[in-house]
Amino acid sequence: MSSTLIVQLDMRTLCQEADITADYVVEIVEHGIVEPSGRTPEEWLFDDQAPLLARRAAKLHQELELEWEGVALALELLQEVQQLRSENSMLKQRLGRFTQM
């Protein structure tokens, strides 16, 4: 029998893992970059992908001096590019089967 481990991080742990301030986390949540469960920052719980997203968001905000809206858009577009690359790779493999016949 297999079990799935679900990791949830509180605000303090997310701040430590992503090396960002609580103020940054609030901004990131307000702009929909990460979506915690819970109603208030004290109750927020984040999944295990949140530190990576939060770190990327903070880096874009600081290094490129993007507004948070721009950060959210940039991350969304980067995710879309990655999905399209994966889909393109899969389709190339499928096409390769037909061209080798």
Swiss-Prot record:
Query: What's a Pfam family in this record?
Result: MerR_2
Q: What is this protein called?
A: Chaperone modulatory protein CbpM
Q: Which HAMAP family match?
A: CbpM
Q: Which gene encodes it?
A: cbpM
Classification via InterPro entries: CbpM
Role played: Interacts with CbpA and inhibits both the DnaJ-like co-chaperone activity and the DNA binding activity of CbpA. Together with CbpA, modulates the activity of the DnaK chaperone system. Does not inhibit the co-chaperone activity of DnaJ.
Taxonomic lineage from the root: Bacteria, Pseudomonadati, Pseudomonadota, Gammaproteobacteria, Pseudomonadales
Membership in a protein family? Belongs to the CbpM family.
Name the Gene3D superfamilies for this protein: 1.10.1660.10
